[in-house]
Amino acid sequence: MLKKLTLLIAGFFVVLQVSAQSQTPNIIFILADDLGYGDLGSYGQKLILTPNIDQLSKEGMTFTDFYAGAPVCSPSRSVLMTGLNSGHTTIRGNMTKKGGNPGKKGVQTIYRANLSEKDFTIGNLLQQSGYTTAMAGKWHLDGYDTLATPIHRGFDQFSGWLVSYPETYSNGYWPAQRYINGKTKIIQKNTDSKKGYYADQITTDEAIDFLSGQQNTKKPFLLMVNYNNPHSPLDAPDESVYANKDWPKDMKTYASMIYNLDQSVGKLKQYLIDNGLSKNTIVFFCSDNGARSEGTKQLTAVAEFFNSNGDLKGYKRDMYDGGIRVPMIVWAPGIIEPGKVNSTPGYFADIMPTFADIAKSKVKYTSDGTSIYSLLNGKQNAVKPRFLYWEFFENGFEQAVRYGDWKAVKKAGKIELYDLKKDIGETKDVSIQNPDIIKKIETYLLTSRVESPFWPVD
């Protein structure tokens, strides 16, 4: 009798475990801000410590040829949210060229665009697919419109900062207020310019608070965790880990910001493991664009000191790979074999179809991307060569295309062509030697985009 009871109990737990594994996976997408391709140990960094993110890489899949949506924040995140490339998505720059919503950046009046009610987001997609959706941290797609927050664009919960609520970011990394589900909340530790509660620590705590409410629910969830680090200004809560380094102060601060980011990721991962969520959760880690070097000599010196973009050419705001190629690591114990490296080109527009596949969604949507979910399951060549597209307006109208190993950058009407397999640093223009490839790219560019009222082509 005792033996039968033992077998029955064992069988019950096996059924329970199989049932849990058969549920649609949860999704967590962690986004760093201005983290360079070469800023992580798993991508070649020698000076900055990133043990937790490196461990994600060892235990998951590391993408070598993954790209953000644009070389700056807002359009890149717009591509991520809508699944449309920067020639189709609503927001194509941090500030508009024409029209938009007025607001203040310091004493200057600037104009921004926002995601509209017509924009179908990954939040909308997963909401309609039965997921609970949440976001913590940076949004940057409201464009001074208080009715264009994440909770108006497909997210059940949002806590973070918004450009339409200046009080939530006016004190940089030490915000005195936080926007939480339609209301602002005072952060007492940061009032009167105090520095008691670091922004990314707040974001991590908010993410864990959300996760704590998901353990006893049958609904799967999407959680977007959008950190500020290591975006300027240089400001870290603790620099003790590099105290003994013979480095200039700015270098210690930047390295400490990335170390803080790494510790935040480690804290989230450990929470998933400790609370039984890791077995059915897929975690993505990425950056919104390349490392920043422009703006001040201070930022240039930091980027060069750490070689933040590795062997890539350019930085944030460049259409060369240093501006748009980013780290991408996916961690999912039991789904992804550890230590895998994938060189298939992909970009932010792929995230929406990938999430749709993970969710087994039947919801209709439009995307310029292709699901990379099959790559996570070990099918190395499952995604066929296709065109990846970017456009940018801050330096005049520029376009970029990736097709297989070919990378094209079009400036002032002239196309430069690089063979990334032989020339990852985009140092040798081989357009003259490859007229057939140029013709193919020119043909693609004829239909790669639609006009935008906010970013007209002069």
At which residue positions do the language-model features occur?
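Bacterial N-terminal signal peptides
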Residues: 6-17
